[in-house]
Amino acid sequence: MPLLNYFVCHRTLGIKRHDLVLEIGSGGDPFLRSDILVDQFVDDEVERHTGLIIDRPLVVADGADLPFPSKSVDYVICAHVLEHVPNPAKFLDELSRVGKRGLIITPKGDYDKLHPKGGHIWYVWNVDGTLLLKQKESWNEYPDIREYFHQMVRLPGFWKLFDQSYPFFNTILEWDGTIRYQIHQDKQFDFSKFRKVHTHHEPSEGIVQKPTPSKQKIKARMARFVRPLISAHTNIDVPRIVCCLLCGGKLSLMSHADTYVTCSRCETRFPIRAGLLRLLREEMTH
C-alpha cells in the first residue's frame, strides 16, 4: 500500500475512532487503523515477503475459525489472504459472523493471470458487490502472458503507475452485514500444481522472522505515535475480547506467569508461546 494511503485510508472507509478494527492475515504490513491482528502462520515464512510486524495485540488463529463472539468487531480488514484459502466459503462466512462490516482486497482475477503467485489458488473479482471466485488449475496457467508481463514491469515508471492505479489491479469489496459470494469450483485442488499452499497447520514453539524492509519499519515507528490519535483501542486486554473456540466462553489468564489461558465455562486451555496467544483447535488441551 502506498505510504499516503496507509495514513488516510481509514477515513475513506468511514472507520470511527471508537470502532474496534480486526485485521486477518496482517503479516508484515498491517493497516494503520487495525486494533487487533490475526495471523495463523507466524511460525512459517512461506506466505510472507517481509518480517512479521507485531506492534499491537496479535492473536494466532485461523481466519476460518475465529475466536471472537458474533458481531463483536466493528470492522474487519482482510487484504491479500482470500486468494490463498482452500475453503473460501467457510472463511468468508466467518468474517461476516464476527464483523459488522469490513473490507476485502485481493489481486484482480485478470491481474493474477498476468502476475500469478505460487500460493494463489483462486481468481477473484467483484461483480456488482458479489465476490466471484474461480478455481485455478495451477499456479501459472498462462506462462506466455506471464513472461510478457514480466518484461513490461521493467519499463521505467511501471510500479509508480501500479500504485496510482490500485483499484485497476486489485479486487476491492466493502461489505456491510454479510459478504455475498459465488464460488466456481469443478473439482478438488491438485496442490502439487501450486507452490506455498498451506493445507494444514503444524504447531510450533516460536516465530519465524524475515528481514523487515525500511518502508515497513518506518510505518511501524510512525504508527506508535499516530494510532492513539485515531483509535480508542490502543490498550487492549486480548483475553477479555476473545472467546473459547469450543463453547464461546470467556478466557482468563490466571496469573502473569501462566503459559496458557483457560475457558471459564469448559476449562479448555489455549497456549501462550513466544508471548503470543495461540487460539487454534489443534493446540488446545483439556
Language model features with spans:
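Residues immediately within or flanking Cys/His clusters that coordinate Zn2+
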Residues: 241, 260
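Catalytic phosphate/metal-binding cores of nucleic-acid and nucleotide-processing enzymes, i.e., regions
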Residues: 2-4, 9-12
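S-adenosyl-L-methionine-dependent methyltransferase catalytic module, highlighting the catalytic core
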Residues: 60, 89-238
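Short metal-binding segments enriched for Cys and/or His
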Residues: 268-283
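Short, surface-exposed charged micro-motifs
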Residues: 65-67, 123, 252, 267-269
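Conserved SAM-binding loop
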Residues: 10-111
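Short, intrinsically disordered, charge-biased short linear motifs at domain edges
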Residues: 11, 227-235, 245-254
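Short cysteine-rich clusters marking metal-coordination/redox-active sites
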Residues: 244-247, 263-266
